[in-house]
Curated annotation (Swiss-Prot):
One of its GO terms (cellular component) is cytosol. The keyword DNA repair does not apply. Keywords: Cytoplasm, Protein biosynthesis. The keyword Cytoplasm applies. Its main location: cytoplasm. Belongs to the RRF family. It comes from Methylocella silvestris (strain DSM 15510 / CIP 108128 / LMG 27833 / NCIMB 13906 / BL2). The gene is frr. It comes from the Bacteria. It is found in: Cytoplasm. InterPro entries: Ribosome_recyc_fac, Ribosome_recyc_fac_dom, RRF_sf. GO terms for molecular function: ribosomal large subunit binding. GO terms for biological process: cytoplasmic translational termination. Gene3D superfamilies: 3.30.1360.40, Ribosome-recycling factor. This is Ribosome-recycling factor.
């Protein structure tokens, strides 16, 4: 077998698509407090833009409440402004160096919109996985054409690629179902 075909690399790239999906799903608001909801918020701090988690500690003291402990007292206003301007529909309450953010419940229409976004993310992940599969199968076909592998090896490796694809698509589907359940939970 040629060094050009690497099943481990194909699996790693497919797992990368799943990791991206899980990160994207983690950012979807579900009505339940999660630090991942505001982690991507960037704050203007010390003359540059920094992620929120580099200027404050984010915690979840209650199921529908986030607490942001700002390390530098002078940064409280900038953190408050960054969270308000992040288009997340959140309004922090400032208490000294701590910002408390109540997570409002989602209405039915917003839940359905979130579910559609989750479906789109999942479909994007499936497409990425299929692209990786196609790349792997193209390499196998080229190796077969160049007579570097036998037909039997090509079929066996193609079957392994398909099995990895099926497993990764099943992982995407289970992540989507779990997120949908979380979104639709009242």
């Amino acid at each position: 077998m040629s060094a050009e075909f690497d099943l481990a690399d194909i699996k790693r790239r497919m797992q990368g698509a799943i990791a991206t999906l899980k990160h994207e799903l983690g950012g979807l608001r579900t009505g339940r407090a999660s630090a991942s909801l505001i982690e991507p918020v960037n704050v203007e701090a010390y003359g540059q833009t920094m992620p929120l988690n580099q200027v404050a500690t984010i915690s979840v003291p209650e199921p529908r409440m986030l607490s942001v402990q700002v390390w530098d007292k002078g940064m409280v206003g900038a953190v408050d402004k960054a969270i308000r301007n992040a288009n997340l529909g959140l309004s922090p309450t400032v208490e000294g160096q701590v910002l408390r953010i109540r997570i409002p419940e989602l209405n039915e229409q917003r839940r359905k919109e979130m579910a559609k976004v989750a479906h789109k993310y999942a479909e994007d992940a499936r497409v990425a996985i299929r692209h990786v599969r196609r790349d792997g199968i193209d390499v196998l076909k080229r190796l077969l054409k160049d007579k570097e592998i036998s037909e039997d090896d090509e079929k066996r490796h193609e079957s392994e690629v398909q099995k990895a694809t099926d497993q990764c698509v099943a992982d995407v589907d289970s992540a989507l179902v779990a997120k949908e359940r979380e979104i639709m939970q009242v």
